Regions:
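C-terminal alpha-helical "lid" subdomain
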Residues: 1-16, 33, 66, 212-214, ...
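A short, basic N-terminal segment
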Residues: 1-57
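Walker A/P-loop nucleotide-binding motif
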Residues: 53-75
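Post-Walker A helix-loop "phosphate-sensing" segment adjacent to the P-loop in P-loop NTPases
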Residues: 78-89, 119-120
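Conserved NTP-binding/hydrolysis module of P-loop NTPases
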Residues: 95-96, 101-122
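Central P-loop NTPase core of STAND/AAA+ ATPases
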Residues: 118-140
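Conserved P-loop NTPase "ATPase switch" module shared by AAA+ and STAND
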Residues: 137-161
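The catalytic "switch" region of P-loop NTPases
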Residues: 155, 165-235, 239
């Protein structure tokens, strides 16, 4: 029997599958944990557990595009935010994960939130009516945390529109007494600076590009444990680590795509290692 000790025990059974199935396995979404991601997850959990009070703390997660921000919040949602029915037969949604409207628009924000409840609404309704519906559903479903992805999109629009949508977010935070988490590129910080009150409510956490160091080598070793290759590639070795860092630029999403494509080539060629 072959020794697949270079693969995580949870994935070793994949090695019994055909090459076609192993190629399909590479395209499946998979969580690769690392220190910064775990710290952000801990911060999200801490926010979710905060007792309700006026002026709830909030968080803005920023980083380069395709560098793992959305993956982290979706992982958090999968672990802590899925809807369920409680003992009283109430539909509970602990976390609402929504996407900011494509431009700064208060009505568009409410519509984006209503979509997450699969609730009927009329886009032609007044902004005030949509706001009321959002607040009612948040209370009825006992929402404890609101996450808004693509937060930097709120920069698109006039200064007046930006103020309106940020004031709407502040109102939701105050009215519902829940933390709000924004996720976006570094430009998202400019959204907060439109008003000192907004900036004071949000802590900012940065998800930087990876430096070429031991942490990057540890990341490569973690990736390798999820690659269904019959031979060890030893991706963490300095020469390979330097090469992958140079090609990916330290961008996590680019690194993941690169490793997947290299693994596919290794399977298809029969080399079975990178």
């Amino acid at each position: 029997m072959s020794d697949f000790s270079h693969i995580h025990p949870d994935f070793q059974h994949i090695m019994a599958l055909s090459a076609k199935d192993r190629l399909a396995f590479l395209d499946e979404p998979r969580w690769i944990g690392y220190d910064t991601a775990r710290l952000i997850m801990d911060s999200l959990n801490a926010l979710m557990d905060k007792p309700k009070r006026p002026r709830m703390p909030s968080l803005l997660i920023v980083g380069e595009s395709n560098n793992g921000k959305t993956t982290i919040i979706r992982r958090f949602y999968d672990l802590c935010g899925k809807a369920y029915v409680n003992d009283d037969a109430d539909a509970i949604k602990p976390v609402i994960l929504a996407e900011a409207p494509p431009s700064a628009d208060e009505k568009g924000l409410y519509i984006s939130l209503l979509e997450r409840f699969f609730a009927p609404y009329r886009a032609s309704d007044s902004t005030a009516k949509l706001r009321y519906q959002v607040i009612h559903l948040f209370r009825a479903c006992q929402v404890r945390l609101l996450v808004i992805d693509e937060f930097h999109s709120l920069l698109t629009g006039t200064a007046t529109k930006q103020r309106e949508v940020m004031n709407a977010i502040k109102l939701l935070c105050n009215e519902l007494c829940i933390p709000i988490v924004g996720v976006g590129t570094r430009e998202a910080v400019r959204v907060l600076h439109s008003d000192p009150q907004h900036a004071s409510r949000f802590d900012v956490v940065s998800l930087p590009l990876w430096a070429l160091n031991k942490d990057f080598q540890k990341l490569l070793a973690s990736f390798e444990k999820a690659l269904p290759l019959k031979k060890a590639s030893r991706l963490h070795q300095p020469e390979l680590a330097s090469l992958f860092h140079a090609i990916s630029g330290g961008n996590l999403g680019d690194l993941h795509r690169l490793l997947v494509e290299c693994s596919k080539a290794a399977i298809e060629s029969g080399e079975e290692c990178i």
